[in-house]
């Protein structure tokens, strides 16, 4: 039998790698003359890290700073707009209470000079019907009166409705007359206001003219005083000679 081969079992040669010594791996720390890690740039008078001083560029930094300042100004302006709009709602002080209108003020504001619209024939009928319905049916609901009254109005003949139609026509005629008189009164008030405005404008113009005349008189008086002063100075000079 052949013996085992020595080449297959021979150990492999390992490469020897030399480790770097401390002299090779030692890093030099950059420092300023005074030992500080920052140095003052003579161009822009800024403190720059000594390790990054080779990448420092004054003109480039100035451009970046200008762009950043512009962006900051824009963002601040946009941020200021929102609080200004919400200033009323975010106030710390107590909100002023709204003055409630009295009943008289409400009536005066709601009721204008115009007359109320006249009732129609159906509503005139219903006002009479409710009176009789309440007297005949005690404790009944208003809904029942309206329902029964509407049915009864439909069942009436034209002759029976004529009484209410005539009343409605009379009320409408009175309403139209009152509207015409009201319009005439409003026109008179407008004319009076216009005349008052014209009078006020004329009075203002007269006052302005008076002020102009007073200023002119004051100016002429000042001119006279200056002329008299010059004459006195000339007389004094002649007396000296």
Swiss-Prot record:
Tissue expression summary: Expressed at low levels in lateral roots, root tips, cotyledons, leaves and flowers (including pedicels, but excluding styles).
Which InterPro entries does the record cross-reference, listed alphabetically?
HMG_box_dom (IPR009071), HMG_box_dom_sf (IPR036910)
Keyword DNA-binding annotated: yes
Q: Where is the composition biased (Basic and acidic residues)?
A: 77-90
Q: Name one GO cellular component term.
A: nucleus
Where composition is biased (Polar residues), the residues are 1-11, 20-29
Please list the GO biological process terms of this entry.
karyogamy; polar nucleus fusion
Q: How is it modified after translation?
A: Phosphorylated.
> Where along the sequence lies the DNA-binding region?
115-183
- Gene3D superfamilies in UniProt: High mobility group box domain
What GO molecular function annotation could you give as one example from this UniProt entry? DNA-binding transcription factor activity
Q: Which UniProt keywords apply?
A: Developmental protein, DNA-binding, Karyogamy, Nucleus, Phosphoprotein
Question: Where does this one sit in the cell?
Answer: Nucleus
Question: Where is this chain compositionally biased, Acidic residues type?
Answer: 182-221, 229-241
**Annotated segments matching region Disordered:** 1-30, 75-116, 174-241
Q: What is its main location?
A: nucleus
Q: Disrupted gene: resulting phenotype?
A: Failure of fusion of the polar nuclei during megagametogenesis.
Q: What does this protein do?
A: Binds preferentially double-stranded supercoiled DNA. Required for karyogamy during female gametophyte development, when the two polar nuclei fuse to form the diploid central cell nucleus.
- What family, per the record? Belongs to the HMGB family.
Q: Spell out the protein name for this chain.
A: High mobility group B protein 7
Q: Which organism is it from?
A: Arabidopsis thaliana
